[in-house]
């Protein structure tokens, strides 16, 4: 029987194939990281030749460099690219459990990254309150901070969709005979990482929505009373707690260090075990 010929768009752009989505993640993350690297170079040049960029621009470059490298670079490469490409292959699955969800995960990531970078074209520049987006500065910063928060909501949605997909794929689509104790170490690393993301990202998603409401609607979840800006008391409503944001942010950002390192350790462990021709001990 004749196979249905896929169009260019369905095969390469809106692909549902786990391998191609992994490649999309990797290539897109590489471009984002190159942009983040360029920001770092300009910041270093500013240190040598003071006055090259303004202090506000320097702050924006620092905030966006950190955001790009963590949320648009390393995590999408280590989880999105390697995870999507290798996990189904290592467990004998034909594809991820939810191919359309996988495609949606990538495009949420892409839209989130582009949304954040749009901040550079807005009046006042990109987000400039650090990659941690600490209030109260983040609550009174320029419009770039608003698009940073919108982009972060897309990125969190992407990570949650991808993590659920990896968990379900690993649990349900393992080839017959591949028991838990026979599971490749890299797959274990991706599985644990996915559980960490599913547990840690929702609080930041909620916090991002709250901070967006502080900026756009006029709430004061993180806006303290009596904030003095430019020698005058800020007119925004107070009563909120900047410390609450820090708790919610670091509920994600501390597990994030394990999200960054666990898949990398899984890759190194697989390579070492394969090359020395001995199974992992432990």
Annotate the PLM regions.
Residues 1-282:
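Membrane-embedded and interfacial regions of multi-pass energy-transducing membrane proteins
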